[in-house]
Amino acid sequence: MVCSYKSAVRLLLLLLGYCVVLQAVEKPNILWITAEDMSPTLGCYGDTFATTPNIDKLAKEGVLYSNAFANAPVCSPSRSCLITGCYPTSLSTQQMRSGFSIPKHMRGFPALLRDQGYFTTNNVKTDYNTANYKEIIEASWSENSNSAHWRNRPESSQPFFSIFNLMTSHQSRSMVWPYKQFKKEIQSQILAEDIHAPADVPLPPYYPDTPLIRREMARYYDCVTAMDIQVGIILKQLKNDNLKDNTIIFFFSDHGSGMPRHKRALLDSGMHVPLIIYFPKKWQHLSPYKPGSTTDSLVSFVDFASTILNLTGVINPISMQGKPFLGPNVTTKRSYVYGHRDRVDEVRDLARSVRDSRYLYIRNYMPHLGYNQPTAWPDKGEIRHEFYRLAKEKKMTPEQWHFAGPYRPVEELYDCLNDPRNLKNLAKSKKHKNILGRLRSEHIQHITDTVDLGFLPESEAWTMFGKRSGWELGQSKSIPFNEIRNAAVQVGIASESEFLKNLESENSVVRYWGAIGLTAKKTISNKAKGILKIKLKDPSYATRIEIANALAVHNEINEALPALTDAVNHENLIVVTHAARTIELLGEKAAVAKPAMKKALARAIKIRPPETPATVVLPGDKDLAMFVAFSCHAFLAIFEN
């Protein structure tokens, strides 16, 4: 009897242990469906013009996030953030596109899921914006192709993490392709009754009301509808495979829509994204929200990787800067989300943003450059030229001119609750002085804490980093960041004497920001011009180019051009990209630079033949060569008529 009792106890313990093991290894499947270039223009977000039944149904079954934000208003920095769980500005992957490396231990968070037995698939876009992209792909994905699918896992019981990237709403489809191509390849996918009528399209106040703009906005909505059909197909496959009851589903876009004033802008129209997360009943305990609910909790792309790891029971690496917003032991919510805008293709820029649940603060560090800078690839779209035409004819309201004009405010502040389209800048409002100060301080604290490498010009960054990654150099605290930050913060605010003082610094990056500060001023003295002329041989080419630009902008073009034409034929294509863009923006008054720009163009074409599609991402100098060609073509076209 005693023996039987002991045997029964042993058997019970074994069974309990077996159940514990089963419970320990059971993991949810994760499905990510990512739309390209799409704002929350969905029925479930209150857009009555949108036709999105499949996504709307998912929202009724899941949780809708009303305050979800990208980290950048363009794709490749966003994807760098999503795959690493780190701010691109801390990795030096903030430019589009970047050739800097990241540390080898940053394999991509799906690699950690693979370590735990997950089958991971990516269909199909990568664009991780780093020299290490091949290593990330190899480590992260069991399958990475346009046929990658959870259905290809070797065992049906194996948990999966699958991504489907839908290009249907991408800027190429919504505004760049010729309209005839859009009709053939996108509009043909949707029912005739679902085609959006241009006459009925709701135009935001920052868009002029013309037939062309109406047609293009209706076209964008058609792209969203076609994308919704694809979402429905994927969700149907999941249901048909009897997997919906064990799969957590994320639907989101990589940033705002590809239309003007959306993509590339730190305004809510460029950064606010739809996010819907579905939890089956089995895994409902991992979400604090009930199905069909809406939450206004702030979430950012930097948090997605750590959230997936937390949902699947994987410990977050120390290097991840994001914090989980779902899963066990989530006790705090975000107070702020942060955004960055840097070089995109040939277009140079640097701006930063901070947003809380109500207010958006933007700091433009190159306020002498407008929102609507000329840019080769999007300029293939007719809608861009409609904006140029109306701006030239001065047929724009103040809300439209904010985007189309040649300059930007140094600081912007918007009450997104009462002004969701960001039309009224409150930065100079006495009533909002304390709010402005709080968000400005938060911005300074964030770029300092995260060591924002975007404040280093690219050519200088390459010199500084050497064989180390930007992350490693930033974490070592060997960069004199506070000195650089303080010089940049003066742009648009400080006096001429402060910028001249910065030009005398031993730090080349401080000198660089001193030159930009002078460029951004409406006028400078003859004394300042004289000092700039003396400094034209600065050993840093980035600084030299900006000194020349300051002279050119302030009517000393003849003194400036020799330095620029020298730089445009430099051996380093990062220097060439910088110089070519500077010459391009100077336009007709830089006519003597034509031979140098023709030479730079010929070199660029040899490196990257012009028949290579602009959407094809190539490593190293090949992408830079495309950006050089963009600027050279645009500049030389001025003189063809």
Specify the residue positions occupied by each region the protein language model found.
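Formylglycine-dependent sulfatase
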Residues: V2-S4, G17-G405, P420-S441
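Long, internal low-complexity/basic segments
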Residues: V25-P28, A35, L64, H272, ...
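Sec-dependent signal peptide recognition
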Residues: K6-L14
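Short beta-strand-initiation
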Residues: L11, V347-D349, P409
